[in-house]
């Protein structure tokens, strides 16, 4: 806690520590300093150059006012009240960059009073970033390239080619970079970049948002400076942005820029399951999202010839994938891993699958950090519409159902049904309502339609499509020679 005291001329400032909205106290307008309320000793702040200075209410107020009024539009906020809230939370030798962060947080908390507080929060936090980082793109890239780890070994954070281009074309890059565009970001957008996207040395952020945009453009286009400039101009003015893996990894020694990977379960065996798990872990390490289909994994209770035992089914296996998604997060702690698991509704473990994300039930049968999706054949929806029976099969006893679609799937399904190979028979509509119940409670499973996806595929010669990726959106568009069209 800081007490605001001083000498010279008094002005009325609202007392934010008192109950009510119209109570005012007299404080000094100039040379206002902080005192420790217990020892009555003067409070100091720690400047960015390492020196100490007596805490001054006026200097904080002047800085905040300048950010609110020197750039248009001028902001409609109560600067004195804001700074009083901040000063009330200061402690001795608090660094100035922490004061900026605290002030921005206070502004963000007042957005519901006036939107201008959000704008001021953005200006403060971006200004703070500029004061803490270098204004030279080339020098920043040089620091990242010459980084040494805790053992003193050279451990470059960017690729050598990117570093060489940044040094060779330093004047060009400095001429196109526009740091004022950092102020186009709102407070929460900047904090997201600061937390996970801007490159750090240790725990210290060394990039500005503009450095990141230019690094991404350089990582994509390399020595093609015209394309680098064009891409930077568009990204920095918010015409578009690249996906997270590109922002994380462009220009680095591991330029993995793809967002989504579609993976098949290698085979229904210990080796196949854990080889697939290893692939998922490696992809997640470099920020890739994963769509994995598990149609070929045998259902619970199915006999295992090698051990003369029975399978535990999908649920325990998916808990292992869930734990991997949590442990092997994206970019080393920057973002949680994301796996979407696809299953066809004829699989005998479908009912347990629908419960995996629910908030109640047996914890040993839950894997709530995964996303779930159904790869639905038209035959199932026809059975739902007619309120007919639906057979559930084990892929080990009834192979091939995931490898065909349309009429071929219908024929194989009917063959297995007539042979009495179903593990269980349920009402299709009852299963459908269980699907809807899970959606209402958890938001999943996503519903995609197997026959339609395969009928519309331009790569039917390559085989049957068995899943989609992590992200499913109905408004997805495809590019044709006549422009973009929504998938229908």
Regions found by a protein language model. Give the residues of each.
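Extended catalytic cores of very large enzyme megasubunits
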Residues: 2-15, 20-475, 488
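Short, structured beta-strand/loop micro-motifs enriched in basic residues and often containing a Trp
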Residues: 473-483
